Amino acid sequence: MTDNIDPYLEIRPYNDEEISAALDRLVQDDEFISAILQHRYANSSSWFRGLVAPFLKFYLKRKWNKLDSVEAIQLVVKKYLEQTLKTTTDGVNYTGLEKLDKDSAYLFICNHRDIAMDPALVNYGLFKHGHKTVRIAIGDNLLKKPCATELMKLNKSFIVKRSVKAPREMMKVLGQLSSYIKHSLDTGNSIWIAQKEGRAKDGNDFTDPAILKMFHVEGRKQKIDFAEYMKSLKIVPVSISYENDPCDIAKARELYEKATNGRYEKGEFEDIESIIQGIVGYKGRVQVAFGDVIVDDFATPEALAEEIDRQIHEHYHLFPINKLAAGLEDDSITDAVRASLTEKLLQLPEGAQQYLVASYANPCNNK
């Protein structure tokens, strides 16, 4: 298959025919094998991990031998996700799914708090309620290793080339991405994308109009005006609320350092550490609210962004810790809730504490 035949080859997820070869490449990827062994045998010597590596490769080859379709991969992911949700949450509640047609494809625009869990939770809710799972937009900043790219493309992720900066190349990349999103929707495949680049570390969930302009690149090519084209995408805002953010302290430290020093130097493996912490960390109760399909005319990206934000803020579920952080009085704010917030603050320098409080308070302030 060549780029001429498949204009999306570089960025799209793998299809069924490509699964086996991708899994073979993963098994033969020494960095991937090393990462698993480092996680599983962190306290063992490198000599021991080197000894175990061939056995792990053999085990994975046997275990993955029958995985030959995207659906088979998704069922494996579902199994691990269910185990994770049992041990790291106090339950996940979904609302709004009954409004969606199971035979339609939607563009889900979601607030972004956690790199891996946000799209995983949206997918899980759709799957449990009889809908097809989504194709997930993921930035290439998270794909610095070949094995990371393989893993993401195996699980229905497509690549957003955020690292491209040259204007001409950027226009080409935006055109390809915009076209791919429309092509996916037209062929019955829903899309998940964050409302802006990066997580809302300060708890402020606002849509970047630039994302909406990117969607319309393909519309402009087809000479369709902004309002009409946006309606054709069947945009559905999604609001995810975590009672406890496992990465809240790390986010507050980052915001504090940026405010104090003017910049923040991210560690080499910091994104991976955030992904792991977001998956294995305690999340408390979780609420995933699907909004209404946007059917009204919005003439500008800014006006449409306001409507997406209105739905996300309206459907955001406020937990007791949000109300406490915002200084509200409420019977749900127990001594345990106060103790939980205090415990978090004690882990931060005094100057950084305001950023953690704000991250929980801002969803209240935006209502």
Per-region residue spans from a language model:
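Membrane-interfacial terminal anchoring regions of lipid-handling membrane enzymes
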Residues: 1-106, 113-118, 123-128, 140-146, ...
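Post-Walker A helix-loop "phosphate-sensing" segment adjacent to the P-loop in P-loop NTPases
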Residues: 131
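Conserved nucleotide-cofactor-binding alpha/beta core module
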Residues: 135, 139-163, 167-171
